[in-house]
């Protein structure tokens, strides 16, 4: 009788504490939902009002993008005229204006939205009613609060019978169905994506086909030591010819200078600052006087001043200072371009794709067995995708950087557990207060404040912490020496996912549950005069109930992310800075945010199914926002042709496995052993499609050229290369040009001064001792259509010194340059795209692999 009485007291105390927690949690959650709804609608209304007034910011892709193929049609001037065009954007239109990577992102978000729709319908129609019926027939009735009707772990008390455990089969079946649904949907979506990707390649222009054909004909080879002499270079070339089935047309040795990267970055920054100072100075003079007057009395206007030194005590003329810096850096860059060293990589160019792939297979087998000089053979990545500053890293340095990066990543996971523990404590602030004596009245008198801290400020803190974590993990990954941007982004995304699962789901849940159970057991031990350890060991079942609070926290997190989407649409930082340029869409960050919402929803779907409607609203809103941004605001400079899809597939299936393991843990805490046994095979079964279909996707997508070769060129034969034509040699020389480091071959940018101010430039520098040199080096008064760089490309080679100083038309998208400054209208063109090379140095007419066989 004493035991029953004690057990009755325990249940009564737990129920009273749960009633207080659920009441505060429900009130605060409703309050934060109302605040976020009002906040989001206010931000959206502000966006609708100011959008027509600032087309440079909210339609920057249309107003500032130089590429005709990526410039969309103009939107209307009405407040809500952006909604219908964005909603009606078709996939073909999105691919045309934003390339395949943008479509891949929208396709992935839409796929997750479809999954959430199916899960929401099933949960609202089956799982939620079953939870209510189960709570009515077993456990505490009436429930402590409305949360007891809709959550799974609130079914039962500690004295539940084996007969009542039959109700656990409902969430168990839901776990099986969710797993089958997600895995099957991912496989079908992957097959559809491969078909769309193949269709996209057929939609490419002829110039794009030529570029892809040129890239597919090139192999990238790494040697153990850079060749320092002509004899060593010839030896490597002979080895490549010997081990290949067909001789290569050309072999280009990589070259570099260790100082050029820093010099070019510094030069670009100085030129942008010089441009801003000049435009501000000349526009002020132009505003007060006409053209003639301004030219005559330009010296009367105050020139811009900057402060230098540790304490900013030295004042100098900003225009003269930046000009001298730019001139010095320009001359230093020219000198360093004449002092190049051979790198440990080279590019072998073949006559056609078939010959290149046959040589790749042959070199891959023979070099590892017969000769150790050639260290690695790979298909050459696209020039836009290469991180050139990492191409010159030797094998030992790259290996050391990889190990150091792995150590930093593991350290970041450990260090991030401390702020995550603080977040978990703030989300359980009531139980933290229960550790202290006489806090019951404090909790009762400050319900609103405690609820707002738990349900509103804590999710915001987690949201900003996650954004900081993404930037930190990207920085760590950048230090590991990956050679391509696509690989860098994929590795960053994988690490962000692992970081989120370990810290934000596992550690946050463990800390939250432990703090909750310790706080409740502290009150119980104090009231029943027992040891807290005895209470904790006997009433472990209460941990299952405390998981509900963690799941409710993710509902608040989803609402905060909806507000974040509204601010992402408003772009307040760009509005404040008056930033007038076309930014690149941050795929890694947005993928990470979308995946965090989906994974958190999946983890809570079987416990708190009410989270699914909130996730459905988020994905619907996210689809709208991201479509608008990709269509009208951001550009996609580097198109990897959907290489991220295999990584996304593996991440989703890994999240399914983690969800299954967590539910096994929750059910084991509730004592549902038969249900746990039925779930044990599920993670093992999920591993099969993860491994098998993941490898299939990787073979299909990495690289694009292999897929096209296997599908279309099974019967093709290599072209005769014994007597190469002039067009073939010209094409090989062009490929060699685009596979040179941009800091070596790219023209230096010039200050972009509006045409009405350019006549005043000589007056600005008439007092300078290097007046003529400045006008010649930094301000080329030539038209935009006929640049001196065009004549440079078309001229013949004269000498080795001229060749080293020559600058070529190359693709402007690389990691060294920020692009042309946007503080004024551009009159000095930046280096053109690869398509512009084709227009000025035309390659032979493109012939498809199928036509080559005819």
Model-identified regions with their sequence ranges:
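Transmembrane transport/permeation module of multi-pass membrane proteins
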Residues: 2-789, 797-800, 808-813, 818-830, ...
């Amino acid at each position: 009788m004493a035991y029953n009485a004690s057990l009755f007291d325990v249940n009564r105390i737990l129920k009273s504490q749960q009633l207080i927690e659920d009441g505060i949690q429900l009130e605060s959650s409703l309050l934060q939902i109302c605040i976020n709804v009002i906040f989001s609608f206010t931000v959206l209304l502000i966006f609708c009002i100011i959008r027509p007034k600032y087309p440079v910011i909210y339609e920057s892709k249309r107003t500032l993008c130089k590429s005709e193929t990526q410039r969309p049609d103009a939107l209307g001037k009405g407040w809500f005229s952006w909604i219908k065009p964005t909603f009606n954007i078709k996939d073909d239109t999105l691919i045309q204006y934003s390339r395949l990577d943008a479509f891949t992102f929208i396709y992935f978000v839409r796929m997750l939205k479809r999954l959430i729709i199916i899960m929401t319908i099933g949960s609202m129609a089956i799982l939620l009613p079953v939870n209510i019926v189960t709570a009515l027939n077993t456990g505490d009735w009436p429930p402590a609060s409305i949360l007891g009707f809709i959550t799974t772990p609130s079914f039962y008390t500690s004295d539940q019978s084996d007969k009542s455990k039959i109700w656990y089969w409902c969430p168990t079946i839901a776990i099986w169905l969710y797993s089958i649904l997600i895995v099957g949907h991912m496989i079908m979506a992957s097959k559809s994506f491969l078909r769309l990707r193949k269709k996209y390649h057929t939609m490419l222009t002829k110039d794009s086909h030529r570029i892809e054909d040129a890239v597919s004909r090139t192999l990238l080879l790494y040697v153990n030591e850079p060749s320092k002499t002509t004899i060593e270079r010839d030896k490597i070339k002979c080895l490549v010819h010997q081990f290949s089935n067909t001789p290569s047309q050309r072999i280009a040795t990589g070259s570099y200078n260790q100082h050029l990267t820093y010099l070019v970055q510094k030069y670009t920054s100085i030129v942008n600052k010089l441009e801003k100072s000049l435009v501000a100075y000349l526009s002020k003079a132009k505003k007060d006087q006409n053209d003639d007057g301004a030219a005559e009395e330009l010296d009367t206007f105050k020139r811009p001043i900057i402060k230098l030194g540790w304490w900013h005590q030295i004042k100098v003329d900003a225009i003269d200072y930046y000009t001298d810096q730019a001139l010095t850096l320009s001359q230093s860059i020219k000198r360093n371009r004449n002092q190049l060293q051979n790198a440990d990589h080279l590019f072998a160019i073949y006559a056609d794709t078939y010959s290149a792939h046959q040589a790749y297979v042959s070199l891959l087998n023979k070099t590892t067995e017969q000769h150790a000089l050639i260290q690695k053979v790979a298909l050459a990545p696209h020039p836009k995708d290469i991180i050139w500053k990492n191409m010159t890293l030797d094998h030992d340095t790259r290996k050391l950087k990889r190990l150091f990066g792995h150590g930093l990543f593991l350290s970041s996971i450990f260090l991030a557990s401390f702020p995550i523990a603080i977040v978990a404590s703030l989300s359980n602030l009531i139980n933290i207060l229960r550790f202290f004596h006489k806090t019951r009245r404090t909790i009762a008198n400050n319900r609103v404040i405690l609820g707002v801290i738990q349900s509103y400020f804590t999710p915001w803190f987690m949201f900003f912490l996650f954004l900081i974590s993404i930037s930190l993990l990207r920085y760590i990954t950048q230090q590991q020496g990956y050679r391509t941007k696509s690989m860098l982004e994929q590795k960053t995304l994988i690490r962000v996912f692992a970081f989120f699962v370990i810290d934000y789901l596992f550690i946050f849940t463990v800390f939250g549950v432990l703090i909750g159970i310790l706080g409740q057991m502290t009150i119980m031990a104090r009231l029943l005069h027992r040891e807290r350890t005895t209470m904790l060991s006997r009433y472990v079942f209460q941990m299952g109930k405390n998981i509900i609070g963690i799941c409710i926290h993710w509902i608040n997190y989803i609402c905060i992310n909806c507000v974040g989407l509204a601010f992402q649409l408003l772009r307040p930082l760009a509005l404040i800075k008056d930033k007038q340029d076309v930014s690149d869409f941050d795929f890694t960050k947005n993928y990470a945010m979308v995946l965090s919402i989906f994974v958190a929803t999946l983890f809570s779907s079987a416990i708190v199914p009410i989270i699914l409607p909130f996730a459905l609203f988020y994905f619907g809103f996210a689809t709208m926002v991201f479509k608008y941004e990709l269509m009208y605001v951001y550009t996609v400079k580097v198109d990897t042709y959907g290489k991220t899809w295999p990584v996304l597939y593996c991440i989703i299936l890994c999240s399914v496995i983690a969800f299954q393991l967590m539910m096994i843990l929750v059910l084991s805490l509730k004592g549902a052993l038969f249900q746990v046994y039925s779930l044990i095979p599920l993670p093992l079964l999920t591993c099969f499609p993860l491994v098998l279909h993941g490898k299939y996707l990787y073979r299909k997508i990495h690289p694009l050229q292999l897929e096209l070769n296997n599908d279309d060129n099974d019967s093709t034969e290599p072209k005769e290369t014994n007597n190469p034509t002039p067009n073939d040699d010209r094409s090989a020389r062009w490929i060699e040009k685009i596979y040179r480091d941009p800091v070596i071959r790219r023209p230096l940018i010039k200050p972009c001064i509006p045409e009405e101010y350019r006549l005043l430039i000589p007056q600005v520098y008439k007092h300078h001792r290097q007046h003529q040199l400045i006008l010649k080096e930094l301000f080329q008064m030539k038209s935009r259509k006929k640049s001196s760089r065009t004549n440079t490309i078309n001229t013949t080679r004269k000498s080795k010194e001229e060749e080293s100083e020559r600058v070529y038309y190359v693709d402007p998208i690389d990691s060294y340059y920020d692009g042309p400054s946007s503080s004024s209208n551009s009159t000095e063109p930046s280096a053109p795209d690869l398509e512009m090379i084709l227009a000025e140095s035309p390659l032979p007419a493109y012939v498809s692999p199928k036509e080559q066989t005819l």
